[in-house]
Curated annotation (Swiss-Prot):
A zinc finger (C4-type) spans 61-76. This is Recombination protein RecR. It holds the Pfam family Toprim_4. It comes from Bordetella petrii (strain ATCC BAA-461 / DSM 12804 / CCUG 43448). One of its GO terms (biological process) is DNA repair. The keyword Metal-binding applies. The gene is recR.
């Protein structure tokens, strides 16, 4: 319910900005905004500066498409990683969960999304051509499709599997230990490690 009293425009703008966060409705956004303005002005200032710094200084890695301050991220530049295996994930959060499993030492490619026809998101919007060029560099031998086990994630994996296999690459999919309909961000590290070990041909 909207408040009976009119709110100052800067406060309304802050509430609307906070509502853009996933899972945050108008009530939660209003509660956050009032908390920051009433109890934590220092935190509000830190949040504003951190957001501005991230927007200004972060870019996409030229190789894996994840976030970095440099042209090439630290993971892609690490000589101890296995460049012959490429793991494709939807988001940087999914990449972090796979890394936390300690079961993978290859490289990554982050799609920054998934195929969702009803939302107008297809291969062109996700720049699949860039992934195909990355996977066809002559070094990659296996591509692990680690998209989420949702309808959109499965559609994405199916499409990529067909195209990548047509390039002569070995294409595998995480094992079904990851529950159907789940997102990797919320799956425990042990389950992800098992799913990586038991991965199957896509």
């Amino acid at each position: 319910m909207d408040p009976q009293l009119p709110e100052p425009e800067p406060l309304v703008s802050l509430i609307e900005a906070l509502r853009r966060l996933p899972g945050v409705g108008v009530r939660s956004a209003r509660r956050m905004a009032y908390h920051l303005m009433q109890h934590d002005l220092q935190g509000a200032d830190m949040l504003g500066r951190a957001l501005a710094g991230a927007v200004q200084n972060l870019r996409h890695c030229a190789r894996c498409n994840s976030f970095t301050e440099d042209d090439i991220c630290a993971t892609c530049a690490n000589p101890k990683r296995d460049p012959s295996v490429l793991c494709v994930v939807e988001t940087p959060a999914d990449q972090n969960m796979i890394e936390a499993s300690h079961g993978y030492r290859g490289l990554y490619y982050v799609l920054m999304g998934r195929v969702a026809p009803l939302e107008g998101i297809g291969p062109r919007e996700l720049d699949f051509q860039r992934l195909l060029e990355r996977a066809s560099d002559g070094v990659v031998r296996e591509v692990i499709l680690a998209t989420n086990f949702t309808a959109e994630g499965e559609t994405t994996a199916h499409f990529l599997g067909e195209v990548l296999a047509g390039k002569g690459l070995k294409v595998t999919r995480l094992a079904r230990g990851v529950p159907a309909g789940s997102e990797l961000e919320y799956v425990d590290a042990g389950t992800i490690a098992w799913a990586l070990m038991e991965r199957k041909s896509a």
